[in-house]
Amino acid sequence: MKNLITVSALLLGSQVTAFSQEQPNIVMLFVDDLGWADLGYNNPVFDTPNINKLKSDGLYFSRAYVASATSSPSRASLLTGKESLRCGFVRHIYGKDTSLEFETFDKDPGKMKSRAYLPLEEITYAERLKEFGYYNMFVGKWHLGTEPYFPTKQGFDAMYGTCEHGHPNNYYQPFFKTNNPFPKARKNTYLTNLIGDGAVDFINKYDKKTPFLLNVWYYGVHGPQIGRKDLSLIHISEPTRLGMI
């Protein structure tokens, strides 16, 4: 039997206390650009029964705020337990040149430098959990650097559906202009479903004796705004927004 703890936020600092003798499996769900009013328990317009159940059966942190309301800084802060500025992130990663340690955003009048990747020297919660025997799986969006700084270099044992892009080109094929992690996916397959199916497949096939950490970091609901076709037909009033949730 697989005992799971599902969390939407997990921050481990420099000190990690010992787990109980029976170590739980941990599933981390992280959704991109999702507002607090974009879920059914805060807004009845949205139909999210499974997420609503997670809330009702667990703990709801109503005053847990992201360190920075943009992609890369939030991810760096979540992984390391640090305020994003302490990791050198002022904004999301803009380019793809890993020869640069810092980069500037063209439209920033102050030309404030921000990191182009999460340094390997930073300690992630995946690396801490490995000290307790965890097998760590990463599924989905990374946006903390290109291949030399991918999840498998930051404490994760394997990854699925990960590339260097900060957002897809489309939620249907072709998902990305280059380095598409799903080149053989069927034409009518929705990207968010591929991420979810990959996570479920990992859980169903996991046969190791050690506990696991499963990071499920969705590309959605980041733009481009493209709703799932079948859901968009149901939600005629707002087919794109409701079709993505």
Question: What is each residue range found by the language model?
Answer:
Residues 1-23:
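Bacterial Sec-dependent N-terminal signal peptides
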Residues 33-36, 181-182:
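A short, flexible beta-alpha/helix-coil linker loop
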Residues 24-26, 211:
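Alpha/beta-hydrolase fold active-site loops
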Residues 28-30, 215:
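Structural cue for short, hydrophobic secondary-structure segments
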Residues 93-135, 142-232:
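Formylglycine-dependent
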